[in-house]
Design a protein with these regions (language model features):
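C-terminal transmembrane bundle of multi-pass solute transporters/carriers
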Residues: 2-5, 78-82, 89, 95, ...
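Flexible cytoplasmic inter-helical loops of multi-pass small-molecule transporters
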Residues: 8-16, 154, 205-230, 415-426
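Helix-loop boundary and gating motifs at the non-cytosolic
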Residues: 15-74, 230-278
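Substrate-agnostic recognition of the 12-TM MFS/MFS-like secondary transporter fold
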Residues: 29-49, 69-87, 91-106, 123-182, ...
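Transmembrane alpha-helix termini and helix-breaking/packing motifs in multi-pass membrane transporters
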Residues: 49-59, 110-116, 172-192, 261, ...
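Helix-loop junctions on the cytosolic side of multi-pass membrane transporters
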Residues: 144, 148, 190-220, 297, ...
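An amphipathic, aromatic/His-enriched active-site/gating alpha helix that lines ligand/cofactor pockets
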Residues: 416, 468-477, 495-531
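Short amphipathic alpha-helical segments
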Residues: 454-478
């Protein structure tokens, strides 16, 4: 008799999910940063409520209220890419520390202006922009260090914990802000936010990040930025994630952008806005646990699409409902749907991007993500200004539901490639009299293959897949040629801008790429022969 497959009971399954979620907390640095970040994010959400309520109190219309979120999101669109390049070039700990100090300084200035009464709508938007600019420079690096703090198998759980932390702050901060605003005035929220940066600064300053040896020459900001754009262009999975996230957030942004106006129409008290935003955060905390259970049963595409569809339905419901209790329930559901989509795509980007380009890829992800939010907030705010907030929310919700159809064209991957480096290529022995420098080039690299004639067709199919890898890692041109006199000989060629860039190619090759390389060489009769040719400029 064959053994029956084991199926865990619902109680065992729930216990397994819970254990997986909390496992990353075993790492002290991750745990300390997470705890410090809770207090910092609570302060951030308290200020967000304070800023939105202050804008309403200054008699600004829905357009100005929505622009508060635009001012928070726009810096990610403008600065995320160079910030990601810095995150891959500079010491990540020092960069995080610098940005935290900058944000603390701006928060102190903003708090002083609000408390003293010298604030105006445009000044509030400008300082919100400056504060968010620090966050834009920090976030790609902050997310890039996550794989350094937890094991690879705990990365999705760590992302979920970050989501729980963030949305726990979203649940606590707004409600606390509403109480403080009602009791002591709106300036209190800005003061609390300024003080909330102290914990993170202390933990980051104490963090002893291991030094990582780099064999390839360091990149420059412009070159690193171009390398990131090239990597995303030739990485199908990463590109699909980024496109999906940007389009979804364009429509999803309407719910939070117009929530202050919805709350103000329901109740004149700031507590109502804090309650609705708190319910959204509480729902996101619950959604993080639902995500772990759902991922064990359904594909990434199914879970993500379901989350977006539910979020769209919640947005439509907010456009219809008028009672505070009903709106609170809808926001609870919407928060859970929100975190399911965000956690999934964030963890996938971190897994798909190798360490050498991770901060830059995350920066591109944040650029499109926050760009979608910034554009969406402005557009749906303008629609709300002219056609009414309910109409704006209705169309945004329908648009969010429609984005689930993108899965037909850009499907989210269920499995991730092994992007660990596979630096096994033989380094050429260069004679001293050649005078080869790091900036010498362009460099023409050729790889000669002697192919088994019976497998020539399979070889060509496999080697043409190599083009995407070569271009992704730095090649500007690529080709495969067959020798007319010796039909079994094939020559692969690609050009790299400099010798330094070719050395970086050695570090960018991954274990997943090596699997394709082994497949290609399995069709050959001997070891491929590699040559490196350096461009020789005419002498003047």
């Amino acid at each position: 008799m064959e053994p029956r497959p084991y199926h865990p009971s619902p109680e065992e399954d729930r216990a397994s999910v819970t254990t997986t979620v909390w496992r990353p907390l075993r790492g002290q640095t991750f745990r300390d940063l997470l705890i410090a970040d809770i207090f910092s994010d609570i302060g951030t959400f308290m200020q967000s409520v304070g800023a939105a309520w202050l804008m309403v109190s200054l008699q600004a219309g829905p357009m100005y209220v929505a622009l508060t979120q635009t001012a928070s999101a726009l810096p990610f669109f403008l600065f995320a890419l160079p910030a990601g390049a810095l995150g891959d070039i500079c010491d990540r700990r020092k960069l995080i520390l610098f940005t935290e100090v900058w944000m603390a300084f701006v928060a102190v200035v903003l708090a002083a202006l609000v408390v003293t009464g010298f604030i105006s709508p445009w000044l509030l938007l400008a300082l919100t922009f400056a504060l968010s600019a620090g966050d834009a420079f920090e976030t790609p690096t902050w997310r890039a260090v996550l794989p350094e703090l937890v094991a690879k198998e705990d990365l999705e759980a760590a992302s979920a914990l970050n989501g729980i932390e963030f949305n726990l702050a979203r649940a606590v901060g707004p409600g606390l802000a509403g109480v403080l605003i009602a009791a002591f005035g709106v300036g209190t929220t800005f003061v609390v936010n300024a003080a909330s940066f102290i914990g993170v600064i202390f933990v980051v300053a104490r963090w002893k990040r291991p030094h990582r040896k780099q064999t390839a020459p360091p990149e420059k900001v412009v070159g690193a930025t171009m390398a990131a754009l090239r990597y995303v262009r030739y990485s199908t999975g990463v590109r699909a994630l980024i496109i999906r996230a940007g389009v979804v957030m364009f429509f999803a942004s309407a719910l939070l952008a117009l929530l202050p106006t919805v709350a103000h129409n329901v109740s004149q008290s700031p507590i109502a806005f804090g309650l609705l935003l708190g319910c959204f955060g509480a729902g996101a905390v619950l959604g993080a646990f639902v995500l772990q259970s759902a991922r064990a049963r359904w594909s990434t595409e199914t879970v993500a699409s379901a989350g977006v569809a539910i979020l769209g339905i919640a947005t439509i419901a907010v456009s219809i409902l008028r009672g505070l209790p009903a709106l609170s329930v809808v926001m609870l559901v919407g928060g859970g749907a929100w975190i399911i989509f965000i956690s999934l795509v964030s963890a996938l980007v971190q897994k798909l991007a190798p360490d050498w380009v991770r901060a830059r890829v995350l920066a591109l992800f944040m650029l499109v993500f926050q760009g979608g939010m910034a554009a969406g907030s402005a557009v749906w705010g303008a629609v709300g200004q002219h056609a009414g907030v309910p109409t704006s929310l209705m169309w945004a919700g329908l648009g969010a539901i429609a984005t689930t159809g993108l899965g037909l064209f850009w499907r989210l991957p269920d499995t991730t490639m092994d992007v660990a480096p596979w630096n096994h290529w033989r380094m050429p022995v260069i004679p001293d009299d050649v005078g080869l420098g790091l900036e010498s080039g362009p460099v023409l690299v050729t790889v000669e293959y002697l192919v088994d004639r019976e497998h020539a067709s399979d070889f060509l199919k496999a080697v043409h897949r190599y083009e995407r890898i070569r271009r992704r890692d730095g090649a500007s041109r690529w080709g495969i040629y067959r020798d007319a006199e010796h039909p079994d000989l094939y020559l692969e060629t690609f050009i790299v801008t400099s010798w330094a860039e070719h050395l970086r190619q050695h570090e960018r090759f991954t274990r997943a790429d090596h699997a394709l390389e082994e497949k290609i060489t399995s069709y050959t009769l001997k070891e491929p022969k590699v040559r490196h040719l350096i461009y020789v400029a005419p002498k003047s």
